[in-house]
Every structure is written in C-alpha cells, then in structure tokens.
C-alpha cells in the first residue's frame, strides 16, 4: 500500500498522511487534534473538496490528519500535496 504525507507537527500546521486503500472501500478520514471537536465539519468539507477535485480520480483512500491549529487554506494545501505525492508527482 502506497503512502504519502505533507505538513508537520509544528504549531499552526497539520500533518496529513494519505494511503491507498482497498478498491471500492471509499474514503476513510481520521481527524485528530485540539481543534477537531470545534471544526470537524469544516475540516471534513475541505478534505472532501480536495478529493472531489482530484483529476486522477483517486477515491479509495485512507486519510489521517493531525491538526495543530492549521488554517483552512493550509489544510487544503497539505491534502493536495499529499495526494499529489501519492500519485508520484513532486
């Protein structure tokens, strides 16, 4: 199973780990961090927006986000980068 990551565990950032999952399994999303209880729905929407706009059509993914106060735009960029790395883009 291929895995890629983007981000860090520094303050105001997040670590996103994306792995391929079994075909037909869909997206499994795990969010962790102090702000998740308050911003879960917003964070989920951002991740799903990136997945839906994925030009390669990757749909069977396991995504883990460890949040440390990242802004929405940072989370979006980290998810995009991790998916690009999973596809083999630099």
Predicted regions and their residues:
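N-terminal intrinsically disordered, cationic/polar leader segments
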Residues: 1-90
């Amino acid at each position: 199973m291929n895995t890629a990551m983007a981000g860090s565990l520094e303050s105001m950032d997040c670590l996103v780990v994306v792995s391929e999952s079994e075909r037909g399994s869909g997206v499994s999303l795990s969010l962790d961090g102090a702000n998740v209880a308050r911003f879960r729905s917003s964070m989920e929407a951002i991740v799903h927006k990136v997945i839906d706009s994925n030009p390669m059509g990757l749909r069977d993914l396991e995504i883990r986000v460890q949040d440390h106060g990242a802004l929405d735009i940072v989370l979006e960029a980290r998810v995009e980068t991790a998916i690009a790395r999973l596809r083999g883009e630099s």
